[in-house]
A protein has these predicted regions:
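PLP-dependent amino-acid enzyme catalytic core
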Residues: 2-413
Length: 413
């Protein structure tokens, strides 16, 4: 049942290295260090130089520092090249910028890591793609598997929103609902590795996923005129996106920015460790009940992933902060009504965290912060309905009732 281990020769000399013991090996279908069992990352020889051209080309303009061979055909749907938007109404000072990942092909940032990992999997000749997911990764894996001509299976928690599972099933992936939370789905998905399937779960398990995530940093750097923001605020479950963005800036040979791990208070293992000064993150033993389902990861069975994220936050001089359900709901409303951006609750957590940090003067006036908006609001229609409230509609009026129309418009006068 096990798959033969194959390797890829990359454009720039690259290798897998262990996050903990510094073991080094070739680019292959390996998910953990053969010496100590820790997670792996990809390292390249030399400092990355940005290519000529425009950011509109998407993530594959950076392929020289991605773990694929020079002549490989990318598995792509046009991911990346997402805008970094200046806010005016939400933050008149101009210090807040929004990295809008909702415009990726399947509506979330997960298209970046999945595109790279699917390309690697196809190059290695693996049998299919599997993931554990709260929805967004599953949708991306299903779509990119279809694009690659590979089978896909998505293991999801029982409470995953129907809007997300409908998208997964629509593109032909098998959906396995697990009674339990994300950690339970994660444990089951790992079993597929022994069948020669690539595990594209969005934790630290697949080192090639982070390579797609890091392109967010490359784009921010270019879109800001090759300048570094003071802060980058990222909604966090296990935290690979945050770590990957930090890695991307490091590969550019620049210092900063300070990284902020934003979590929902109902599931905040990284924040808890940060606030108590702990060196290691513990599994979240409380109930996990939050509208921000896309980042509700209690890390049960793999708390070391949270520890890795915590280490990056501290290394960058950043912070970790939790926000309440009401703060998240308000941020969802503000983004929609002030900036025209529909985001899911998991993404709104980052915006709520920024507002909280600004109010506490952690983020100072004059500093620039990029908030990463990770997923589209259409991923979770129920959350949108809750945020909109009943006051948005006037009720049914008679055709031709100009007075009723005028009454509806009076709210803007």
């Amino acid at each position: 049942m096990g798959a033969e281990r194959k390797s890829i020769v990359t454009t720039v000399e690259a290798s897998l290295i262990c996050h903990s013991c510094s073991w080094r090996g070739e680019i292959s279908n390996l998910y953990s260090c053969p010496v100590c069992g820790s997670s792996l990352l990809v390292a390249y020889a030399g400092t990355y130089e940005l290519p000529n051209g425009v950011v509109d080309e998407g993530i594959w303009r950076y392929r020289r520092f991605l773990p694929v061979s020079a002549d490989s055909e990318p598995v792509t749907l046009g991911e990346g090249a997402t805008p970094t938007l200046q806010t005016r109404r939400l933050d008149p000072s101009g210090g807040l910028l929004l990295k809008n990942e909702t415009v990726n092909p399947t509506g979330s940032f997960k298209d970046r890591p999945v595109a790279v990992a699917a390309t690697v999997a196809r190059e290695l000749g693996l049998s299919g793609l599997v993931c554990a997911s709260t929805g967004n990764t599953g949708v991306a894996v299903a779509a990119y598997a279809a694009r690659a001509g590979l089978p896909a299976a998505c293991v999801v928690p029982e409470a995953t929103p129907a809007a997300k599972t409908a998208q997964i099933g629509a593109v032909g992936a098998r959906i396995v609902r697990v009674r339990g939370n994300y950690s339970d789905a994660y444990a089951l998905a790992r079993a597929a590795e022994s069948y020669g399937w690539a595990n594209l779960t969005s934790t630290y398990i697949n080192p090639y996923m982070l390579e797609g995530d890091k392109t967010v940093a490359y784009e921010i750097f270019e879109q800001l005129g090759k300048r570094i923001p003071d802060w980058v605020v990222v909604p966090v479950g296990a935290g690979p996106l945050l770590a990957a963005i930090h890695k991307g800036f490091e590969e550019l040979g620049v210092s900063g920015p300070r990284m902020v791990a934003a979590q929902a208070a109902a599931c905040a293992p990284v924040v808890s460790a940060f606030e108590t000064g702990a060196k290691q993150v513990s599994e979240w033993e409380h109930s996990v009940e939050t509208a921000a389902s896309s980042i509700a990861d209690p890390l049960r069975g793999y708390p070391e992933d949270g520890t890795r994220t915590l280490s990056v936050v501290r290394q960058s001089g950043g912070t970790a902060i939790a926000v309440s359900e009401e703060e998240t709901r308000q941020a969802t409303i503000e983004l929609a009504r002030s900036e025209g951006l529909l985001v899911e609750p998991g993404a709104a957590v980052a915006a709520a965290a920024y507002r909280k940090l600004a109010a506490q003067a952690v983020v100072s006036t004059g500093e620039r912060a990029v908030v990463v908006l990770t997923g589209h609001g259409l991923k979770d229609p129920d959350a949108l309905r809750s945020a909109a409230g009943s006051e948005a509609e006037t009720g049914v009026v008679e055709a031709g009732d100009v007075e009723a129309l005028g009454a509806a418009l009076e709210v803007y006068q």
